[in-house]
From Swiss-Prot:
Protein name: Uncharacterized protein RDT1
Lineage: superkingdom: Eukaryota
Miscellaneous remark of the record: Shows evidence of translation. May be a new protein-coding gene that originated de novo from non-coding sequences, e.g. transcripts of unknown function that escape exonucleolytic degradation (stable unannotated transcripts or SUTs) and associate with ribosomes.
Organism lineage: Eukaryota, Fungi, Dikarya, Ascomycota, Saccharomycotina
Amino acid sequence: MIRQKIFVFIVKSRRNSICPAIRRKEDY
């Protein structure tokens, strides 16, 4: 569970740097 959370955090941070608009849509 911990590793999965870290992986998701990294993926979200990468998406945020690539396209902040996508992060807003996926923000929940």
